Amino acid sequence: MKSYAIIQTGSKQYQVSEGDVIDVELLDGISEGQEIVFDQVLFTFDGSKVSLGTPIVKDAVVKGQLLSQVRGEKVTAYKYKRRKNYHRKTGHRQNYLRVKISNLVI
């Protein structure tokens, strides 16, 4: 069975394995092509052994390569009051970093 880990970054959790491409919240001071180290590993599975952190697995690290900065889907908010000719439409697009997971150090 394939090894994987569950990491936490940007107050969100992701299940990752080698070769996966994920979109994470923006991180400060990172440029394209740079290696990113995720050290908040909550759970690991290497094919036979399970390691569950309390809350973090010691000495477990997930490394990834920054591919690009992307934008998420547009979220539209619409306010409306009946009979008052009042309506407001606003939108928001979140910026993300696209990261390719290169190595799991379990």
From Swiss-Prot:
One of its GO terms (biological process) is translation. It comes from the Bacteria. Pfam families: Ribosomal_L21p. Keywords: Ribonucleoprotein, Ribosomal protein, RNA-binding, rRNA-binding. PROSITE patterns: RIBOSOMAL_L21. GO terms for molecular function: rRNA binding; structural constituent of ribosome. InterPro entries: bL21-like, bL21-like_sf, Ribosomal_bL21, Ribosomal_bL21_CS. One of its GO terms (cellular component) is ribonucleoprotein complex. Belongs to the bacterial ribosomal protein bL21 family. This protein binds to 23S rRNA in the presence of protein L20. Part of the 50S ribosomal subunit. Contacts protein L20. This is Large ribosomal subunit protein bL21. It comes from Chlamydia caviae (strain ATCC VR-813 / DSM 19441 / 03DC25 / GPIC) (Chlamydophila caviae). The gene is rplU.
